[in-house]
Amino acid sequence: AAFAGLTADARVLIRKARVEAQSYRLTVEDNPSVEYMARFIARQQQKHTVRGGVRPYGITCVIAGLANDGTPELWQSDPSGNYSAWRATTTGRNQKATREYLEKNYPADGEEPLTREQSIKLAITALCEVVDSSSKSIEVSVLEKGKEIAVLSDEAVEAVCKTIEAE
């Protein structure tokens, strides 16, 4: 999960989501779906929006994962409790510009899907539209079927940034 907003709120929601995922796994003896976790997080956010005496969570969450068949899923929830599925999305400062870039450059349904390298390059290029194009301001995590989540090294990100700048 990634988030934009108040870090303390994110920690609380992530802790609640982890407990819920563990409870689900013990009860059902299977991993919860990405949608289930997105719905759980959105429900927690919505409860704090309508309940008196507590302030709303001040974060937007982006939840990524793999379905049981290995297909990638991407969900986003906002402080009001709305959640929705995306093929590619952004959150935080300059969200509009990066989302517009992704909408223009992400393949439409039915088109050839992006390779791992193409996906990384597209994500970094979208970020370079709004931030300094260096490895110090960009962090990339890669989620692949059958593998652990990988965080790209600064050198790998810097190499992609240099390729983008050269184009």
Question: What does each model-found stretch correspond to?
Answer:
Residues 1-167:
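Long, low-complexity N-terminal extensions
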